[in-house]
Structure formats: structure tokens, C-alpha cells
Amino acid sequence: DAELDNDTYEAAEKQYLQNNTKQAISSLSGYVSKFPNGIHALKANFYLAQSYYADGLENNSVANYEYVINKQRNEFTEQSLARLAEIHLKKNDYTKAAPILKRLEAEADFPQNVTFAQANLMRTYYDQKDYANAVVYADKVLANPKTDNKVKSDAQIIVARAAIQVNDEPKARTAYAKLLTIAKGELAAEALYYDAYFKNKDGKYEDSNKTVQKLAKDYSGYKYFGAKGLIVMAKNYYQMKDNFSATSILESVIKNFASYEDVGAEAQTELNMIKGEAAKTNSS
């Protein structure tokens, strides 16, 4: 009956409001199981979720946050959506995070929650190889003047990588050029590598080699892009008719970077091509 419902809830809420987390969990879960559709079911589920979360029991809180977001929009909807998204993202569960983030983007009143949703939808779509949507969200993130540089850098890299994946070279060039001005560490190494890569494609072989040298000197810690840069350098030497330098660089890459299978395979393909061409020239 209503009186028992009210009394049970009030006793539980009191524990919650006094920050007695363990007692709040015990009494709120008692209320929720006794009155699943009780007068205070919405508040009780939200407070129970918050208590679990505060006690480090994030997985336990999911069902109660879900109860809140499945009800008509209420004062706890936005906070529950943000919390659920955070819990799923922490576990890299992008399949569960995506629909929650979409709702948060659409329903949030706080601008920082919209920004959070857009930045994470961008990462989620990229992770799921949905490059078209990843770019849509990266563009939203970049268009937001309040986005901080770290997230802008992430957005720029996603635009660039997605463009490479879908062979949109003009977009990739622009994105990597912008990235070069803001990136640090490994992202800067990646941007420099593509700078050398596009210079090679444009026939600027000397300039491309200078960029590879800068990559090797300033970003020596990032071996993967260093190795890929050396392959570009070998291609430059080949175009400049210096087959000896080209083959010795490629042989060195194959020997020293065997742990990067894609790099080794690319170097081998390039080496086979140069040797094949040389054999043709010698036999003619």
C-alpha cells in the first residue's frame, strides 16, 4: 500500500542523502525489489545506480540507469545517459555505447555532454570501420569552437585516416597537413610520414627524403612510421635512378623491422619490383 511504499522509500532515501553508500545500496535495492513499480521507483533506481557507481560497482549500476533512461524523459535522464555511455566506453563496448551516445547528443541540455557524445561517436564509428559516419562526427567536433586541442587532434587524425581508407586523397592531404601543425608525439610522426608520402607522389623526391630524415631524427621513438618512411625514401631513390641506395634501404627495413608484418611485406614487394625491373634492363 502507499503508506508502506512511502515509508520504505523514505528510510532508503535518508541513507542515500547521508552518503551511507553501503546502507543505501541495501535499502534502495530492497525498495526496488519490493515495489518494482512503486511511487518512487524512478528516484529509487537512479539513487541505487548512483550508489553502486560510487561504491565502484559500475556493472551493477547499468540495469538501474537503463530503467531511468527507458522512462519518459525526466530530471535524471541526461545524467544516466552520460554515465551509461561512460561505463560502456570504459569497456570499449562500442556496440552498446553508440545508441546511448546518439540519445545523449540529441537530448542533452549541457553543451559539454553534447561535445562528449560527438567526440565519442566519432571514435565509435571509426572503431567500427564506419568511416563515413566517423568523418561526419569528426567534422562536428572540429566545427565546435569549445573543443580542446587534444580532441581536435583526434578528430583531425580520424578525418585523415578515414580519407586514406576510402581513397579520398585530397581530403587526406588537407587533414594531414592540418594535423602537422597541432599534433605531438606519435600523431606528429604519422603526419610527417604522410607529408613524405604525398611529396613522393608529387614527384618531389628530394623534399620527400628531407621529410623522412626529419622523421627519423625528431621522432626516432616511433619505429613503425620511421620504417614506413624509409620505404618512401627507397621509392624516392629508385625514382632518382639510384637503385643501389633503394635496394640497400629496403633490405635493411626487411631485416630490422620484421615485427611489423605490413611494413616488411611492403618493403619486399618494392624490392621485388626493383630487382625485376633491373633484370629486364640487364637482359635487354
Language-model segments: residues:
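Acidic, polar-rich low-complexity tracts and alpha-helical solenoid repeat scaffolds
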Residues: 1-284
